[in-house]
Amino acid sequence: MTALTGMADTYNGPLHIDINGTTVDQTSDITIEKQADGNYTLKLMKFKFSLKGVPMNVGNIIITDVPAVSNGQTLMLKVKKNIAIKGGSMDLMLKSVPIDMIGELRDGDFYTNIDIIMEKLNQKIKVTFGTAKYQLPNAGFETYHTATVTSPDDPNEKSTSDEPDYWHSFMSASGNPGLVYMAGYNPVTFKCDDVRPGSTGKQSLMLKSIDMYIAIANGTITTGRMNTGDFTASNTDANYAWSDMSNTDKDAHGDPFYATLYSLPDAMKVWLKFKQGTANAEHPYATATAIINDGTEFHEPAPSETTYTNVVGEARNAKIAETGDEWKEFTIPFTYDAFAQYGAKAKSVLVTLSTNADAGKGSDGDLLYVDDLSFVYNAGLKAITLTAENGEMFTVDGVNSETKEYTATVPFDVTANNLKAISDGKGAYVSTTNADGKATFEITSNDLATTNVYTLNIKKGNAQGITSGINGAQAAQAQTAGIYTIDGMRVNAITKPGLYIVKDANGNVKKVLKK
C-alpha cells in the first residue's frame, strides 16, 4: 500500500467487493482528507466493477464529517449515515444511500470496511480496502513451503524441510554459513495432521529438538529470521531470532522475514502440546514470546548488556510445562507499561516458539506441537473516572465489562474534560458523549471487530455511587527516578540515540541503548 502525502493522503491497495455474496477483487485508490474541524473526508472515486460480466458504474463515494478517535497509536474513523453517490450511471437511484463505515489510519497505511445498502437495487455491497493485519498470516499453520539449506563447501549438498508460510527456522537462517548449514541440516519443523480439539484446520506444526553432538538444537520457529553465529548455543550476541522491516531479503515462499502489526493486542492465545524427549528437571519448559516493536532491528533474546528502546509491548511465557499427549490452550497477556517510556509505535511483531526456554538445554527429541495462534483484542469497560476542580479524582462504583448502565450522583458539574472511561483493551478506541445528564461510552476493540456501548446516568448532588481516590497528579507520579546520559546529564526522556543510565524509584540501575 502506498500513500501520497500533501493536502490529502491517497492510498493505493487491494479492494475486495462483496455484492450479496458474489465477490470481486481489484486494486483502487482511496483518499483521506483531514477537515478543519478535525473530522475526515473519505473519497473512493469512480467506483465501478464488473458483476458476472455486467459492468456496474456506481460513481463517486464521498463520505464527509467522519469522526476520528485516537488510541495513542492509530486513528479509528467510524460513521453511519446516508450519502448521495454521484458521477455514475445510477445517480437517480442513489440520492440517499445508507452507509456504515469503519476504518483505521496507521503510519502510511489505511484499512477500512464500508457497507453500502442499495435498497432500490436490492443489493448490499461490502467494500474492504487494504489489509487488516490484526492477526498473523498462516497462524493456523495450514500451508507450508520448502526451505533449503546448502553447504558452503559444496553447492550440490543440500537439505530441505517444510517451513510454515510466513514462519522461519534454521534452514532459512542468517549468520555463519557453515554454522547455518550445521544447524539447518537436520529439520526441526514438520507439518503435522495432529490438530487441536475443535480446529477447523487440517494441519498443525511440530517442532522437534535435535542432538547436534556439540549441543542440542532446540526446535524453534519465528516470524522473523533465525541467526546462527556461534557454536555456544547460549551466546545471545550471535544466536537469536531477529527482524528488521528495512531488510529486503525474502524466504523461499517470497515473503519477508518480519510480520507487520500496527495494533496493541491484549493477549496471545495459542494451542500447544509439549513432550520432552528425556525428562530434564533443570530445564523443563518450552517457551512462547511475542515482542511488538517499531519495525527497526530487534533481537530476541537481546544481546548482552543491551536494552532495546524500540519495544512497545511483549507477551512472554517461558514456563510452558509438559502437557503429555494433551493439547492445551495458553493465554499469554501482553504487558506495555515497562516500555511506555520509550515512546515507540507499533509496526511489527516478532513471535518465537521453542521446545526449550533455555538455549541448548533441551534433550534430543523434545516435541512442541503448535496450532491456531491468535491475538485477543478487548473492548470492555474497566473504569469511569471523574475529576473535581480541586484535582480530587472519583471512580464510579461497580464498573465492569459486563454491566452496561450505571448511575452516579456527583457534587460538581460533569463535562467532557473531567469525565473519562478506561477500557480493558490496551488499544481500544473510546468515544464519549455527554448530554442531558447521560454520558455514553462507545468502546471499539483495536481490531475493529467488537463494539460495546455503556451509559452513565449523572445526577447533581451529594456523592453517591462514586468513590473518592487520591489526587490524580499524585497517582500518576513517574516510576522512574531519573534518566541520565552517559556524561551524567539528567534528561526527561530517552529521545536521541545513545547510551543512557536509568535509575528506578527503588534505586535499581540499568543501561539503555537507543539506536
Regions found by a protein language model. Give the residues of each.
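Aromatic (Trp/Tyr/Phe) and Gly/Pro-enriched flexible surface segments
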Residues: 130-265, 269, 283-294, 298-331, ...
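Beta-sheet ligand-binding and adhesion/scaffold domains
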Residues: 76-133, 227-239
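Predominantly extracellular/secreted and cell-surface proteins with exposed
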Residues: 26-28, 32-105
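Beta-rich interaction/scaffold domains
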Residues: 378-465
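Extended, low-complexity, turn-rich repeat/linker tracts enriched in Gly/Pro/Ser/Thr and Asp/Glu
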Residues: 50-52, 274-284, 296-299
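Short, solvent-exposed loop/hinge segments that bridge or flank secondary-structure elements
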Residues: 14-40, 91-94, 151-182
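Edge beta-strand at a domain terminus
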Residues: 6-14, 24-28, 60-72, 105, ...
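C-terminal outer-membrane/trafficking sorting elements
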Residues: 462-515
